[in-house]
Regions:
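Short beta-strand-centered segments that line the small-molecule binding cleft or hinge
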Residues: 18-22, 28-55
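Extracytoplasmic small-molecule ligand-binding "clamshell" domains
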Residues: 1-30
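A ligand-binding cleft/hinge motif common to bilobed small-molecule-binding domains
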Residues: 22-35, 92-98, 126, 131-162
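Bilobed "Venus flytrap"/periplasmic-binding protein-like clamshell domains
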Residues: 48-123, 138
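Hydrophobic residues within well-ordered alpha-helices
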Residues: 13-14, 73, 125-126
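Extended ligand-binding regions for polar small-molecule ligands
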Residues: 61-64, 74, 151-193
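Solvent-exposed coil/turn segments that connect beta secondary-structure elements
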Residues: 18, 23-27, 44, 62-65, ...
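Short beta-strand->loop
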Residues: 37-51, 106-111, 145-174
Length: 193
């Protein structure tokens, strides 16, 4: 098993160097729609329907009254983890495309936070180094459940969605969660012993 960045995973799938992938469905939908098919998917208490369990939260400081919707982030500095298959950046880019804007040039800059360090996105936003941050859906709730509530009153989620199947704060449409896609054309998996 290997941990690959989104770009490396795309190249590996295209080169047919992998048979089984564990990645958010956004990767499957946006980066490899014709190369992989879903074998199984993960569900959670926050999203019992695996087909609608992954989204992203766009956060801003509560005192940034100039930032009310995703549209207001045009030309702004955004912090995000971008070298994972999808911690939220792909879902947000999809929302930007729905605004009839080019997601590759919409933001003024994207401040890259190292993978597995999503909490640093909060630091960028709270310190003012970024105007907004992109988090995976349920990241805030996971921090709060772990007892880290120091920033709760200082941030808000833009375009917060409710009642769509995910019991966490999020700004984007929902996608299937973490499927286990198999490369099309892979040899059949042997039966379990």
């Amino acid at each position: 098993m290997h941990f690959l960045s989104a770009e490396s995973l795309e190249k590996s799938v295209a080169a047919k160097n992998v048979d089984l992938v564990v990645a958010p469905a956004a990767f499957l939908a946006f980066s490899a729609p014709n190369s992989l098919h879903e074998l199984a998917s993960i569900v959670s208490d926050a999203a019992p329907d695996s087909s609608r369990s992954l989204g992203a939260a766009v956060i801003v400081r509560r005192d940034r009254e100039d930032l009310k919707t995703l549209k207001d982030l045009r030309g702004k500095r955004v912090a995000a983890v971008v070298d994972e298959p999808s911690p939220g950046i792909l879902e947000v880019k999809r929302e930007v495309a729905r605004l009839n804007a080019d997601p590759d040039v919409f933001f003024g800059s994207i401040q890259t936070v190292p993978r597995l360090r999503m909490k640093e996105v909060l630091s960028h936003v709270l310190s003012g180094r970024a105007d907004a941050g992109i988090l995976r859906g349920c990241f805030l709730e996971d921090l709060w459940k772990a007892g880290n509530r120091t920033f709760e009153a200082e941030i808000r989620v833009l375009d917060a969605k409710r009642g769509d199947g995910l019991a966490c704060r999020h700004s984007t449409a929902l996608y299937p969660g973490w499927p286990w896609p198999l490369r099309k054309g892979s040899p059949r998996m042997p039966p379990a012993p």
